């Protein structure tokens, strides 16, 4: 799973790649270093739903945060024209470029997504999926006009969670102050059916899928 819990130095932190997950060396509550899982392939069902939302219009899709490439794979399976991916971590950006090597409709941009936006390196998109390391506190980019990279009817969805160093679940906007607050966002409930734990989300519990249409 992609990363929400690390500071600006995250992009230079060494990651460790395992078969089903990715870890980073992190300081625990006792002050000792311990491996923290920051991405895990148990998120397939959630990422599939996010991909369905952002690719509903087809066309040009922007994905922020490549992670393990799970959501990217589902986005590619949709009827889309182009797929732009912004990834800030150097190791993951390398993996994204390897993944995209045989996909002519994919463009990989390495860098902080806010910088890429402010530097006007992006076009307009029909769908956007946000799952970067540091999504919290990003509301201003969507509230203060003009947000210039959305076509009319563009569908935005974003990972609905908080600190991934702790077990947690997705929350509705009015249930947790740390959820990204973008006016006009609707939430659709998704029942977690798998018996595999998803960041503290147990079988039968609900994850709330955000959607905003511009």
Regions found by a protein language model. Give the residues of each.
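Class I SAM-dependent methyltransferase Rossmann-like catalytic core
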Residues: 2-57
């Amino acid at each position: 799973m992609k990363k929400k819990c690390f500071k600006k130095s995250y992009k230079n932190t060494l990651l460790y790649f395992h078969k089903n997950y990715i870890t980073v060396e992190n300081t625990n509550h006792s002050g000792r270093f311990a491996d923290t899982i920051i991405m895990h392939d148990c998120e397939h069902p959630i990422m599939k739903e996010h991909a369905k939302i952002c690719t509903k219009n087809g066309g040009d899709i922007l994905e922020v945060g490549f992670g393990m490439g799970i959501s990217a794979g589902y986005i590619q399976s949709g009827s889309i024209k182009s797929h732009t991916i912004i990834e800030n971590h150097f190791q993951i950006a390398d993996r994204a470029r390897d993944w995209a090597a045989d996909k002519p409709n994919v463009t990989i941009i390495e860098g902080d997504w806010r910088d890429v936006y402010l530097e006007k390196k992006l076009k307009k998109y029909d769908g956007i999926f946000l799952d970067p390391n540091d999504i919290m506190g990003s509301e201003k980019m969507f509230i203060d006009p003009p947000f210039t990279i959305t076509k009319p009817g563009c569908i935005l969805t974003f990972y609905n969670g908080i600190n991934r160093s702790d077990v947690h679940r997705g929350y509705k906007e009015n249930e947790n102050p740390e959820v990204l607050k973008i006016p006009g966002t609707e939430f659709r409930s998704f029942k977690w059916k798998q018996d595999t734990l998803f960041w503290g989300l147990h079988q039968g519990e609900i994850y709330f899928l955000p959607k905003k249409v511009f």
